[in-house]
Regions:
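Short, charged, low-hydrophobicity "junction" segments
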Residues: 33-34, 38-42, 52, 57-81, ...
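Short glycine/acidic-rich loop motifs that flank beta-strands on beta-rich extracellular proteins
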Residues: 6-14, 36-44, 58-66, 86, ...
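Flexible loop/turn segments at secondary-structure boundaries
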Residues: 8, 48, 70-71, 124-125, ...
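Intrinsically disordered, low-complexity Ser/Thr- and acidic-rich flexible linkers and loops
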Residues: 15-19, 67-87, 103-112, 120-155, ...
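Solenoid scaffold repeats with emphasis on beta-solenoid/beta-helix
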Residues: 2, 20, 24-25, 43, ...
Length: 201
């Protein structure tokens, strides 16, 4: 029951510890108004629910991602492997109301909004990374850094997007590098449907 208004971004993480996921997170019944970027970012979350939130005039609704190489960290001496526990999974996104702002420019980069974006990552390891989908991925604006994250495909799995309502000039619901996910009962009503950045699902 929190309210976020006229701020840059809402709830969530923009960094992570490799192989140490966030677990048992509940983000419910919050209100987000007039946010420049995303309302909710679930980065390397597991066993999480995002339900009953109202997001009005936001740059993005709910962003779920397995790994974000450019902002992932390791503990000194930690042995890392792409087989570790860094696969975001078992996440429910349900009964949210999302209205997305017009596309804009943030820090000199084009920002195209989305209602719900569920994505994994293909990492090149210390040399950098491959972005998970389109070249205009709004989350990939930093320069690659050498941070010891091993190369690999970090798939997102077991995410359900259910009974959400999405409107605005944006992409509705996007999946990339995902498996065993489901999308059902959602309502997507977009404006300017003749443009490339206004895809339903």
């Amino acid at each position: 029951d929190n309210t976020f208004e006229d701020v840059f971004a809402g709830i969530g993480s923009h960094s992570m510890m490799f192989d140490k996921p966030y677990k048992n997170i509940t983000i419910s019944n919050n209100r987000f108004n007039n946010l420049k970027k995303r309302a909710i970012w679930c980065l390397n979350y597991q066993d999480t629910v995002v339900t009953g939130n109202t997001m009005t005039n936001v740059g993005g609704g709910v962003y779920v991602r397995s790994v974000y190489t450019r902002n992932a960290h390791t503990v000194s001496g930690q042995e890392v492997s792409p087989e570790g526990n860094q696969y975001a999974e078992n996440i429910l996104i349900a009964d949210n109301q999302i209205t997305v702002l017009e596309p804009t420019v943030i820090d000199g980069k084009q920002w195209n909004g989305y209602g719900i974006w569920i994505t994994g990552e293909v990492s090149l390891g210390s040399a950098g990374e491959i972005i998970p989908s389109e070249d205009d991925d709004p989350e990939n604006t930093a320069n690659p850094t050498t941070n010891g994250i091993p190369a690999g495909r970090y798939i997102i799995r077991g995410v359900t997007a259910r009974n959400n309502t999405i409107s605005g000039n944006c992409d509705g619901i996007k999946f990339s590098l995902a498996e065993d996910c489901s999308c059902r009962g959602n309502t997507v009503r977009l404006s300017d449907s003749h443009t490339y950045n206004n895809m339903g699902i």
